[in-house]
Design a protein with these regions (language model features):
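Catalytic center-proximal scaffold of phosphoryl-transfer enzymes
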Residues: 1-266
Length: 266
């Protein structure tokens, strides 16, 4: 998420959002989000933030993440990438809304069928989700892949539709990751929803003003938005937490002050 650094907008900085939300499959870990402040959008920033993380990362199509999946990745093993079907759908929707393309309409219909299965299995265990996806979703995804290949052979790669189809094809491996692990979501909408409050807040807090201000913005936003997704009232949490720190809350028990552990006083 781009944030302005100076009033004349000649310099820009970014907040990168990293989120965890296992509620759709009944995970035990509470949801949370952290906004990392960085002076740019280059892939090395993501590499730094994710140093030590090994696993599956749900992302959009931004190419800066590509280095994370390479054997040469710094800070850990190559990350398994799960790409976002909502972004794939959005590409076709843009074409359909503009041109009324029948090809785009057919692609949208196929994606809608895949999403219908996700609606059916939301809230079930990872094993149940995986079984349903392998039995029901995998054939639909395979059919979409066949359809995608056929349309790319018919449509000029330089056309608007051709460019959108190429985008989907370029991310095809990552679009299939959700078929192999029941914990993986079909899209990255959860984290995108957590970026939206930052974008809205820019209208009220137009400028970070300084690198330290940007970093502080990210830290405070991390606490506030994590409160909100855990149904914790942010002001009550911040007030109680500051009071606890002022009263000498021990650093050895810092986890007690995380938003999901907050217990409001009666």
């Amino acid at each position: 998420m781009k944030i302005a650094w100076t009033p004349d907008l000649t310099v820009a900085r970014y907040l990168w959002a990293l989120a965890r939300d296992d509620r759709n499959w009944g995970g035990d870990d509470p949801p949370g989000v952290v906004y990392f402040y960085a002076p740019g959008r280059h892939g090395e920033h993501a590499e730094t933030f994710l140093s030590g993380f090994n696993g599956i990362l749900q992302i959009d199509g931004y190419p800066g993440y590509n280095r994370l999946a390479r054997p040469s990745r710094k800070g850990g093993d190559p990350i398994v990438v799960a790409h976002c079907w909502a972004h794939a759908r959005r590409k076709l929707k843009e074409i359909f809304d503009r041109d009324g393309s029948e090809i785009a309409a057919e692609g949208l219909h196929q994606i809608t069928e895949i999403y219908a299965i996700e609606k059916d299995i939301r809230g079930t265990s990872p094993g149940q989700r995986l079984s349903a996806r392998q039995a029901r979703s995998a054939p639909l995804v395979a059919a979409f892949g066949t359809w995608l290949h056929a349309q790319r052979g018919r449509v000029s790669p330089k056309s608007r539709l051709g460019e959108k189809l190429a985008y989907i094809a370029n991310h095809w491996d990552g679009l299939q990751t959700f078929l192999t692990d029941g914990r993986v979501e079909i899209d990255s909408n959860n984290v995108e929803n957590l970026v939206r409050p930052i974008a809205l807040n820019r209208k009220n807090a137009l400028f970070a003003g300084h690198d330290e201000g940007g970093a502080a913005w990210g830290r405070l936003a991390s606490l506030v938005e994590t409160c909100k997704i855990n149904n914790v009232e942010p002001f009550a949490y911040l007030k109680s937490t500051h009071e606890a720190i002022a009263a000498g809350h021990p650093k050895s028990r810092i986890d007690d002050l995380l938003p999901w552990n907050f217990q409001p006083s009666s």
